[in-house]
Amino acid sequence: MLFKKISKFVGWLSGSSVGSITSKTHE
């Protein structure tokens, strides 16, 4: 399913790039 692939990709982004950026912003 395409949606599943997108969810996985978004989750991976949140875990790596977005996650670190958000952490720095929240500090």
From Swiss-Prot:
It comes from the Eukaryota. Keywords: Chloroplast, Plastid. It is found in: Plastid, Chloroplast. One of its GO terms (cellular component) is chloroplast. Its main location: plastid. The keyword Plastid applies. This is Uncharacterized 3.0 kDa protein in psbT-psbN intergenic region. It comes from Anthoceros angustus.
